[in-house]
């Protein structure tokens, strides 16, 4: 949404009534209305039997390519990009470990496509492979070898690999620069190249990527028909599972009726579910998806209370009530805030009951404290706005990295994960704002501020940077673009072994950043979800693959 979780309050003036002080911002209503209120699953036993049989065929296929490492990495890449890698994690991890162990032997290969593909797959899975494997393709003047310049597939592979660069890897910076400049003139004639330039694999959400790549793979003459059939069937089965989940969430939202009762707020529960699908789409994370969708939908409403509707006095009462986390505090709130407050406490109580059943009740307190921390920063930003105070960048970012809600969402994303080993130490780690979380929060905050600047009457990083440096908005945006690129490199570095946490945890942090990158690149596709986001949701949650 427009500065989705960066709160601000209306500017107060003298001799005005409470209602005069409220800002009036017009957001479009839900584009989905009651569309998802009644979705039957429709998954048949025949479909599940077919899926299992085809899955076994793909396992056999993976085993058959054991001795041909080029065929192996091509198959692994296709499996992952088709969105079915989660079925074969054990087999893929085993294969990549073997490839990594023989990396120095196979690194003598002079095919840029193969070298870049191997590098990317290993970096994707956290292996600390060196970037100097590309030195032989770039001369001392920073020019690519002639054989690479004329190799479109190799250039595309190099582009994708160089997006996994880390700080200080100048050769990957140069590779990204060169490959991008050579691919851009070809984008209008190639859907694959155009989509890669718009969203490289490193920033692509699995379900969206699968939807696009299935149609590309279908046209590949070297495609494996069994793998293609499996990917299509799996996509459609998952879609039915997600539709059924969304039906239950849509009914909960309909019962709350906050979209009608709080007309100043954005009604975006379907968009919120789509957001969370980007964090985890696999069937086993259904409880986590349900809780996270409800949390993000409620946070969106709370953000609009601080950003659009609340007066400073009301916001202080609301903040105090949430910090107390006591239903008796509801009596101190105006009617419209009572609706939200009661729903908020009820939502966390529901999840707490679920966690008690799983003997994981301690997790809720971490999530609750992060929500309290979030609204506390909302209140501080509201005070800035009322006093017309513009902080310096350091002061702003210290608060804004929290008010961007990314840290709250990252912690909360772990609460409903069952089956995977998530411990109290993991929650302690993530709530202490580790480097990967701070880097992801920078991406969230700055991308959000750039697309929202000038739309809302609020203080943002753009204002702070312009004032502090006496520069134009264009210069500020340029600087933030550099900082976002640096933050992605920091994410890549934290992803590589040795890691500070398990992949199960780190992938949530990175996936949240990928969602932000999708929704806030160039425009606010959450606040205005009626065009781009609507079409993306249709592709993932409405239309099956034929």
Curated annotation (Swiss-Prot):
This is Germacrene-D synthase. A motif (DDXXD motif) lies at residues 303-307. Binds 3 Mg(2+) or Mn(2+) ions per subunit. Belongs to the terpene synthase family. GO terms for biological process: diterpenoid biosynthetic process. CDD domains: Terpene_cyclase_plant_C1. Its cofactor is Mg(2+); Mn(2+). Keywords: Lyase, Magnesium, Metal-binding. It catalyses: (2E,6E)-farnesyl diphosphate = (-)-germacrene D + diphosphate. The Asp-Asp-Xaa-Xaa-Asp/Glu (DDXXD/E) motif is important for the catalytic activity, presumably through binding to Mg(2+). GO terms for molecular function: germacrene-D synthase activity; magnesium ion binding. It comes from Ocimum basilicum. Sesquiterpene synthase that catalyzes the formation of germacrene D from trans,trans-farnesyl diphosphate (FPP). Pathway: Secondary metabolite biosynthesis; terpenoid biosynthesis. InterPro entries: Isoprenoid_synthase_dom_sf, Terpene_cyclase-like_1_C, Terpene_cyclase_plant_C1, Terpene_synth_N, Terpene_synth_N_sf, Terpene_synthase-like, Terpene_synthase_metal-bd, Terpenoid_cyclase/PrenylTrfase. Mg(2+) 1 binds at residues 303, 307. It holds the Pfam family Terpene_synth_C. Its EC number is 4.2.3.75. Mg(2+) 3 binds at residues 448, 456.
């Amino acid at each position: 949404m427009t500065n989705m979780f960066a709160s601000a309050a209306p500017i107060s003036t003298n001799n005005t009534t409470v209602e005069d002080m409220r800002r009036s911002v017009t957001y479009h209503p839900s584009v989905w209305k009651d569309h998802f209120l009644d979705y039957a699953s429709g998954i048949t036993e025949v479909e599940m039997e077919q899926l299992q049989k085809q899955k076994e065929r793909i396992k056999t296929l993976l085993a058959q390519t054991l001795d041909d490492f080029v065929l192996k990495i091509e198959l692994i890449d296709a499996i992952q990009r088709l969105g079915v890698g989660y079925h074969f994690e054990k087999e893929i991890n085993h294969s990549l470990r073997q490839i990594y162990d023989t990396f120095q032997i196979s690194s003598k290969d002079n095919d840029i496509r193969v070298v870049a593909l191997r590098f990317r797959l290993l970096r994707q899975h956290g292996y600390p492979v060196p970037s100097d494997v590309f030195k032989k393709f770039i001369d001392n003047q920073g020019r690519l070898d002639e054989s690479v310049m004329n190799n479109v597939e190799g250039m595309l592979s190099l582009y994708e690999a160089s997006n996994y660069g880390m700080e200080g890897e100048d050769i990957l910076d140069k590779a990204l620069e060169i490959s991008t400049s050579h691919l851009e003139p070809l984008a209008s004639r190639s859907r694959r190249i155009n989509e890669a330039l718009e969203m490289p694999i490193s920033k692509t959400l699995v379900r969206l990527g699968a939807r696009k790549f299935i149609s590309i793979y279908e046209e590949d003459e070297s495609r494996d028909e069994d793998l293609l059939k499996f990917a299509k069937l799996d996509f459609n089965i998952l879609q039915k599972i997600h539709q059924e989940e969304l039906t239950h969430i849509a009914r909960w939202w309909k019962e709350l009726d906050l979209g009608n009762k709080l007309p100043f707020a954005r009604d975006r529960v379907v968009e919120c579910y789509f957001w969370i699908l980007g964090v985890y789409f696999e069937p086993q994370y259904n409880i986590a998806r349900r809780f996270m969708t409800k949390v993000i939908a409620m946070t969106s409403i709370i953000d609009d209370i601080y950003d659009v509707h609340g007066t400073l006095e009301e916001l202080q009462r609301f903040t105090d009530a949430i910090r107390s986390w006591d239903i008796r505090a509801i009596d101190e709130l105006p009617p419209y805030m009572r609706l939200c407050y009661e729903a908020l406490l009820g939502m966390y109580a529901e999840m707490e009951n679920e966690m008690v059943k799983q003997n994981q009740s301690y997790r809720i307190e971490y999530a609750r404290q992060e929500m309290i921390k979030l609204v506390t920063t909302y209140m501080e930003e509201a005070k800035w706005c009322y006093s017309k105070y513009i902080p310096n960048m350091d002061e702003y970012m210290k608060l804004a990295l929290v008010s961007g809600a990314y840290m709250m969402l990252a912690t909360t994303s772990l609460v409903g994960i069952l089956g995977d080993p998530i411990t109290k130490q993991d929650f302690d780690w993530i709530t202490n704002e580790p480097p990967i979380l701070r880097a992801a929060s920078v991406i969230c905050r700055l991308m959000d501020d750039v697309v929202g600047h000038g739309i809302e009457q609020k203080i943002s990083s753009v204002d702070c940077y312009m004032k502090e440096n006496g520069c134009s908005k264009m210069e500020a945006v340029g600087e933030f673009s550099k900082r976002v690129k640096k933050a992605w490199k920091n994410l890549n570095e934290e992803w590589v072994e040795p890691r500070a946490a398990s992949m199960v945890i780190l992938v949530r942090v990175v996936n949240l950043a990928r969602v932000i990158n999708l929704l806030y690149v160039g425009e606010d596709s959450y606040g205005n979800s009626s065009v781009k986001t609507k079409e993306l949701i249709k592709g993932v949650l409405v239309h099956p693959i034929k």
